[in-house]
Amino acid sequence: ISLASAGESYVLTPGTGSGSSLSYFIPIIDHCLKAKQVDKSPRTRAIVVYPMNALANSQLEELKKFLGADPGTRPVTFGRFTGQESTEEREAMKANPPDILLTNFMMLELLLTRQNAIDQQVIANAKGLKFLVLDELHTYRGRQGADVALLVRRVREALADQLVCIGTS
């Protein structure tokens, strides 16, 4: 938590079920709360990448428990962009970007490369991104690992001057 708060990137290798997501969500939420006091414009400040949609879906439910199920009353907003969303949900995310975007590596790649208006605006809403989290980092091996490494570089180049990268394994 102290590394993330200091703007340092890190990899965390805890045991299964040890609450590793708190090691990145606490500094992300802290940053979002502080940043929103200075700049109230809605934008995505953190992207969390999961290797499987099931993990993103599970984490979405945990965030609802932690931050509140009613989007109108949450101090920090979050949304999922995994390809399972309806056009209406994607349009809503385009118009009202979440502070925290949950996705998978393939959808993040598509967001960066597709030329449709929704995807372009979702990415534009993440300019100035502070955090990029890769959950279950050990699952990206071989060619897929090289693809994800390139994706991290592309995200940094497109969205962030001072990106904090966090990996859990």
Residue ranges and their predicted role:
Residues 1-169:
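N-terminal helicase ATP-binding lobe
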